[in-house]
Amino acid sequence: MFNIPAVAVSYLIGSLSFAVIVSKYYGMDDPRTYGSGNPGATNVLRSGKKKAAALTLLGDAAKGLVAVLLARVLQEPLGLSDSAIAAVALAALVGHMWPVFFGFKGGKGVATALGVLLALSPATALVCALIWLVMAFGFKVSSLAALTATIAAPVAASFFMPHVSWVWATVAIALLVLFRHKSNIVKLLEGRESKIGGSR
């Protein structure tokens, strides 16, 4: 009965674009108007405002975490199924990528996906975070780190997540993140992708 409202609330939480909100708070340009045009922490970092980038990263991860944790806490009182929790997780990411509050022009979903995974399975999130860190420090390319961690997510989920529906949600999340990184994949293949902190 409460499945659809829960998914809708999760989508609305996901639709809060912290890159835009934080940038506006600091009097910065809209991140959709410079760099890669992506409203995410990496692009905000291109403005030179490290604090704003950090707050964007934390905010985007937190909204994914909060949306799913809220559903999990209320799962029994509201009678939400495990599949409903999976749908809530996916809705938070969809909200980030296509936010109703910002003209459906959102980010690529890496931080929000991490927050979602943390709420579903801390072990899965930890594996992905460690892979991202190793790749980011090793190659200094944010998109490469994100893509590697994204590909690893469903594999880790299959080991650590207690419900099959959550594993399939992780597969869907990974596919969405990969889809949103299609331009980055092309740049990586062509050797044109920018380094972390670069201007492109």
Curated annotation (Swiss-Prot):
Pathway: Lipid metabolism; phospholipid metabolism
Signal peptide segment: none
GO MF annotation: an example: acyl-phosphate glycerol-3-phosphate acyltransferase activity
GO terms classed as biological process: phospholipid biosynthetic process
Reaction(s) this enzyme catalyzes, per UniProt: an acyl phosphate + sn-glycerol 3-phosphate = a 1-acyl-sn-glycero-3-phosphate + phosphate
GO CC annotations, alphabetized: plasma membrane
Enzyme class: transferase
Membrane-crossing residue ranges in chain numbering: 2-22, 51-71, 84-104, 114-134, 159-179
Primary residence: membrane
Record keywords, A-Z: Cell inner membrane, Cell membrane, Lipid biosynthesis, Lipid metabolism, Membrane, Phospholipid biosynthesis, Phospholipid metabolism, Transferase, Transmembrane, Transmembrane helix
UniProt topology in membrane: Multi-pass membrane protein
EC number(s) on file: 2.3.1.275
Subunit structure comment from the entry: Probably interacts with PlsX.
Protein family according to the UniProt entry: Belongs to the PlsY family.
Protein function: Catalyzes the transfer of an acyl group from acyl-phosphate (acyl-PO(4)) to glycerol-3-phosphate (G3P) to form lysophosphatidic acid (LPA). This enzyme utilizes acyl-phosphate as fatty acyl donor, but not acyl-CoA or acyl-ACP.
Protein name per its UniProtKB record: Glycerol-3-phosphate acyltransferase
Lineage: Bacteria, Pseudomonadati, Pseudomonadota, Betaproteobacteria, Neisseriales
Gene behind the chain: plsY
